[in-house]
Amino acid sequence: MKFIDSDLQDYIGTNFSVSKNNQGITEMTFLNGTSLFNKTNYAKIMLGQCTDCDYLYKGFFEGFIYDKVLIAGLGFGLIPQTLSEVNNCSKIDVVEIDQEVIDYNISSGHLNSDIVIIKSDIFEYTTNEKYDLIIIDTIWDESEMTDEDYGLLESRLLPNINTGGALYVPI
């Protein structure tokens, strides 16, 4: 799924900007030059539901049932919105470090009310909640996460995964 581009506000901020590109697709561009696009395949790829994608992106979670999900990284909120509207998950928590990204999404009003946004760094976040699936959507390139970083995330988050659940770090 994707959002209706006209429903997403243009924005120029301190850490990122949001605008429509030449094709009318909304784009969130961060200071480091990384861009997110409001496209249907983004959440499908991240959730292994892309039927017309390269084989690397198909069926990640085939046969895996999840209902309670924690996502690190908000962006436009395509993943949590898909989990809410398409997958009908009962619990969707999102940890986002950037208050500006949180404020943009709240003021834009395009996310469902069942999505809980938590201001925190995923490397410092603690909770007693248990999840079926934890998705780390904060990394754009494998060089951005060291083995030490992964080990830290794994040791912090594995206690929060239900039996049979998964930690998904797509790098």
Can you annotate each of these PLM segments?
Residues 1-66:
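Class I S-adenosylmethionine
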Residues 2-11, 51-171:
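The AdoMet/dcAdoMet-binding core of the Class I SAM-like
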